[in-house]
Amino acid sequence: LEGIRLGTTLQHGKLDGHIRKDGKRTPLSLHLKGEDITFQFHTNNTWSGFHMQLQEGEAKLYETEQGKATPFPPKKIGEAIINSDVTYEDLSLRFLYWKDAEVVGEDKIKMQSCYKLRLRNPGKDGRYALVYIWVHKKYGALMQVAGYDVQGRLLKRFHVTDLMTVDKMQTLKKMNVETYEAGTNKVTGITYLEFKKPSKAKRRGL
């Protein structure tokens, strides 16, 4: 999973893009500093956001109030950002850091050979109890995600529609996030995440 985690994607230190919903674009910026990843989005002429800290192999979300970082309330982790289909746990991809990951098979996504992995939520926070991800066999890039609740009902699907090469690695450029009516195949909303290829800079890692 190391190759598809945000720490690897952000080796340049910064990634810019936007969240698009119903034709409205909201600027988005991701920054890496040590083991802290900052997510910022621009609304009403103001930048706001949250942090994800990598601690002992776990990814924990924090919000900043009056200059002090405090842990996310469990319910907030699964809340939507700026009325989109993207939640805080979706944007952070924190499930990629869950320790209970297992390869359960192989599949074809957009005619590309992929490994299918199952990840189980080690806690009770967030909306997902179980997540399946599909990783490109050749490039090691994330191709698709499906998130399920504790009752096994499908809640979300992420479809990666475009990749970009960063430091000779294939990583996320465009992704669609679909919300489903729980337990059905009915899509109730869709939001697009799009990132720009970072300009060349000094290579940075975790």
Please give the residue ranges for each predicted region.
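Flexible, processing/modification-adjacent segments and terminal tails
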Residues: 1-2, 6-12, 56-129, 149-150, ...
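N-terminal mature ectodomain segment of secretory-pathway/periplasmic proteins
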Residues: 1-65
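Short hydrophobic/aromatic-rich beta-strand segments that constitute the beta-sheet cores
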Residues: 17, 37-41, 59-63, 71, ...
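Short amphipathic beta-strand/extended segments with alternating polar/hydrophobic composition
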Residues: 27-33, 50-55, 69-76, 158-160, ...
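Short, ordered beta-strand-loop transition motifs
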Residues: 31-35, 105-114, 165-168
